[in-house]
Swiss-Prot record:
Enzyme Commission number(s): 3.5.-.-
Keyword field: Hydrolase
Record-given protein name: Beta-lactamase-like protein str6
GO molecular function: hydrolase activity
InterPro entries referenced in this protein's UniProt entry, alphabetically: Beta-lactam-related, Beta-lactam/transpept-like, Beta-lactamase-like_AB/R
Classification lineage: Eukaryota, Fungi, Dikarya, Basidiomycota, Agaricomycotina
UniProt pathway annotation: Mycotoxin biosynthesis
Organism: Strobilurus tenacellus
Length: 304
C-alpha cells in the first residue's frame, strides 16, 4: 500500500529503516508523556501541520533519534546508513557564500564558519528548527566527524549560539588529537627498505607544523627534488625548502610544489598535477600497508 500522507511516508522510508522511534508529528497516547511543553506558546505542540507543512515544521523528535541519524551522516559506511560516502561528500558542500564571509548555504544546510587553532576556517553544517517555543539544532563538523544535537523549549534565541560555542570549545582539543594521530601515521624519515647510503637513493622527511603536513626533504633516485623545484627562477628564486602535502582523500596527498610569478593562474590551480611520469601525476603521494608510495618515480619507502 502506497502512503498517501507525508507522515506515513516518512515513517515507512525514514523512521522505520533508521530505527527512529522518537519521531512523530502529533502527540498521541504512546508519546504524550515524553513531549516537552513550553510555558509560552504551548498550543503549538498540538498543532497538526498537515501535509503542506508537516515536513518543514511539524515534526517532533528526540535526542536519541538525532544521535542515530547523525551517526549515519558522520559515518556513511555504517550498515544502517541510507546515503553512501560519495553522496555525503557532494551533499555537504557550500552552494553560496554571503558577504560576511562567515555564513554560507548548501543544499538544505545552513553553514557557519568558525576557526581552528591555526586561524583557518572550519565549516559547521547545521539544520536549525525554530517555532514559537521550540528550538532544535542538528550540526556537523565534517572534517572531524563530530556533531552536536541540541533540543530545547522556550523563546530564547540562543540555541544556535550554544551549539557553535560547543564546537569552538572542542576545536582546540580536536586539533591536538588530530595532530598527534597525523604524526603517528605519517611523520618521520622514510627511506628505501635496503638503503644504507644516506647521500644516494631515495628518501623523504615529513613533519607536522601549524596543523599541516610538510615534506622537508625529498630525494628521488639520487636527485634532491626540492633544491630544483623550490629554487627555480620561474618560482621566484630560493624559497622555503619545504612543501605542503595537500590531502585528496584518506592516505592520499598531492605535493604542493607550487608556482610563482611566471604563471598568471592561481598557484593552487597550476600546482596540481603539473606533469606525469609512468602514468601517474608527479606530485602524487600515497600511503598503503605502512609504506610511502611515489608512483611517478617508481619509489616505495618505509619509515626508519
Amino acid at each position: 500500500m502506497i502512503p498517501n500522507r507525508w507522515r506515513d511516508l516518512a515513517r515507512r522510508d525514514i523512521f522505520e529503516p533508521l530505527g527512529l522511534n522518537g519521531s512523530y508529528f502529533i502527540p498521541n497516547a504512546h508519546n504524550r508523556a515524553h513531549v516537552a511543553v513550553a510555558s509560552k506558546y504551548s498550543d503549538e505542540v498540538d498543532i497538526d501541520f498537515l501535509d503542506v507543512m508537516a515536513c518543514s515544521g511539524g515534526q517532533m523528535s528526540s535526542l536519541s533519534d538525532y544521535i542515530k541519524l547523525m551517526q549515519t551522516f558522520l559515518d556513511p559506511t555504517l550498515p544502517q546508513s541510507l546515503l553512501p560516502a560519495h553522496i555525503m561528500r557532494e551533499w555537504m558542500t557550500p552552494v553560496f557564500g554571503f558577504n560576511d564571509d562567515e555564513t554560507e548555504v548548501g543544499l538544505l544546510w545552513e553553514i557557519v564558519k568558525i576557526q581552528d587553532s591555526y586561524c583557518r576556517p572550519v565549516r559547521v553544517y547545521e539544520k536549525n528548527g525554530v517555532l514559537g517555543a521550540s528550538r532544535s539544532v542538528f550540526a556537523i563538523h565534517r572534517e572531524m566527524a563530530f556533531g552536536v544535537a541540541l533540543l530545547n523549549t522556550g523563546t530564547a534565541t540562543v540555541t544556535g549560539n550554544i551549539a557553535l560555542e560547543i564546537f569552538r570549545i572542542m576545536q582546540p582539543y580536536l586539533d591536538k588529537l588530530q595532530e598527534r594521530k597525523v604524526k603517528e601515521r605519517f611523520a618521520g624519515h622514510w627511506r628505501l627498505p635496503l638503503q644504507t647510503n644516506a647521500t644516494s637513493g631515495s628518501m623523504v622527511d615529513i613533519s607536522v607544523s601549524d596543523g599541516s603536513l610538510w615534506i622537508t626533504r625529498l630525494v628521488l633516485n639520487g636527485t634532491d627534488v626540492l633544491s630544483l623545484t623550490e629554487a627555480m627562477p620561474a618560482f621566484g628564486g630560493a624559497r622555503s625548502r619545504r612543501v605542503a602535502l595537500w590531502s585528496m582523500r584518506r592516505d592520499e596527498f598531492r605535493m604542493v610544489l607550487g608556482a610563482g610569478a611566471a604563471t598568471s593562474c592561481m598557484s593552487s590551480w597550476t600546482a596540481m598535477d603539473s606533469g606525469f611520469s609512468r602514468g601517474y601525476p608527479m606530485d602524487l603521494v600515497y600511503f598503503k600497508g605502512g609504506r610511502l608510495h611515489i608512483p611517478s618515480a617508481g619509489v616505495v619507502l618505509v619509515r626508519a
